[in-house]
Structures are given as structure tokens and as C-alpha cells.
């Protein structure tokens, strides 16, 4: 009985170790294209002055400008302007979070430690003070990424945490595109994005951003219009 228990323990320990050290080879990164698609959105701000915007829009530029924005429950220009500002912010954050994982973490593996914490889920922490400074994080702040991958190694969730300052979680559902499909969506921008990387278009993004200092939580969902 003891021998069997020992075997299971060793197998589990070896599996955990292998997964922990395998994050950077497990990760299969695809550049995301956000252009030339129509999307449905739902944005809610929870706090003292709650806000709620639902409707559809189109992303039309490299700055993720929301055009053709239509709200389901309001036609006031100030509401449309506010919704467009929030949409741009949500998309910029989602894209920046996604890209930073690759640009900062993947290319500078030695500056991060990866800890396996659950099936296909890793915690990434800064390994040195130099990396903290580059990421504009104070030396006393507790900061880390939680990254979930699917069975094939593609990103499904990124959580960026600076304790007592902010907590951002974004879930990604993506569709890999052929070079022809990517070019049709992104035009010349795909020549920059593609390189040797695969390209995807997101079909659904869900996220939340909380900041205890302002006592507000942003909850949003943006998905491709069928």
C-alpha cells in the first residue's frame, strides 16, 4: 500500500514539475487582429455611479476607434460618446495585456519565474528588480500574471494583478485565420503583425477591471456579431 502511494506521489510530483517548467514551450502565441468586424458589446460599471451600455459597433483603425456605434437603449450623443470611449479603453487594455505577455514575458523568459498552479494554468512573477522597473511596478508591490492556456497551448485567460491597486482579468476566445483571411481583415497591418506568427481574430472577449482606490469595477463583453 505504501509503495503504491509512493508511486502516485512521484508521478504527481514529476507531472507538476514538468508542467511548471514547460510553460514557455507550451505557449502558442497568435497575434490578434481587431479590425474590420462588427461586434456586439455589453459594458457595465459597478460602484457609486453605475453605468450600463449595450449595443453594437465596428473597430475601424489602428487606434481601435469605435465607429457605427449604436446603443440599444439610448440615442443621446453624450451616451454614444461615453460608450465609444469605454469600448476603446476596454479593447486597448485587452490587446495590451495579450501582447505584453508575449513581448515582455516570452522574449525575456529569464526575467520571470513560472509556477504551475492548476491544470494548464501558471503564475508568472518578476524574477528581478530590473524587470519591475521596466514594467513600472514599485519594489514593494505584489505583482503577477495568472495565465491559462487551452490543451493546444493557446491563451484563454490572462489575469494581471497588482495587489491593493488593480486586478484585471480577460478571457479570450479566438479563431485562427489563414493569411488570406487575415489580410482581408487587417489590410496592410497584417504585414507587420504576421511575420512568422500565426494570426487570430477574437470571437469573444470577456473581462473585468477592478480598482479599490476608485471603488469601481468595469465588467465588459465584446463578441463578433453573427
Where are these regions (language model features)?
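Positively charged n-region of N-terminal signal peptides that target proteins for export
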Residues: 1-4, 19
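N-terminal, post-signal-peptide region of Sec/Tat-exported proteins
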Residues: 44-78
Amino acid at each position: 500500500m505504501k509503495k503504491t502511494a509512493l508511486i502516485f506521489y512521484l508521478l504527481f510530483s514529476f507531472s507538476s514539475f514538468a508542467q511548471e517548467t514547460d510553460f514557455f514551450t507550451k505557449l502558442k502565441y497568435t497575434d490578434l487582429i481587431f479590425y474590420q468586424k462588427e461586434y456586439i458589446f455589453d459594458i457595465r460599471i459597478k460602484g457609486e455611479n453605475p453605468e450600463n451600455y449595450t449595443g453594437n459597433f465596428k473597430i475601424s483603425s489602428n487606434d481601435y476607434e469605435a465607429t457605427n456605434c449604436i446603443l440599444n437603449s439610448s440615442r443621446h450623443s453624450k451616451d454614444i460618446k461615453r460608450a465609444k470611449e469605454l469600448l476603446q479603453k476596454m479593447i486597448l487594455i485587452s490587446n495590451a495585456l495579450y501582447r505584453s505577455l508575449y513581448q515582455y514575458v516570452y522574449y525575456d523568459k529569464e526575467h520571470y519565474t513560472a509556477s504551475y498552479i492548476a491544470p494548464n494554468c501558471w503564475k508568472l512573477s518578476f524574477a528581478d528588480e530590473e524587470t519591475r522597473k521596466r514594467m513600472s511596478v514599485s519594489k514593494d508591490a505584489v505583482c503577477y500574471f495568472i495565465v491559462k492556456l487551452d490543451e493546444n497551448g493557446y491563451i484563454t485567460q490572462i489575469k494581471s494583478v497588482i495587489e491593493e491597486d488593480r486586478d484585471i482579468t480577460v478571457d479570450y476566445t479566438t479563431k485562427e485565420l489563414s493569411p488570406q483571411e487575415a489580410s482581408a481583415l487587417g489590410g496592410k497591418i497584417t504585414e507587420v503583425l504576421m511575420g512568422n506568427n500565426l494570426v487570430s481574430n477574437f470571437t469573444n472577449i470577456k473581462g473585468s477591471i477592478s480598482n479599490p482606490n476608485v471603488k469601481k469595477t468595469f465588467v465588459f463583453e465584446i463578441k463578433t456579431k453573427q
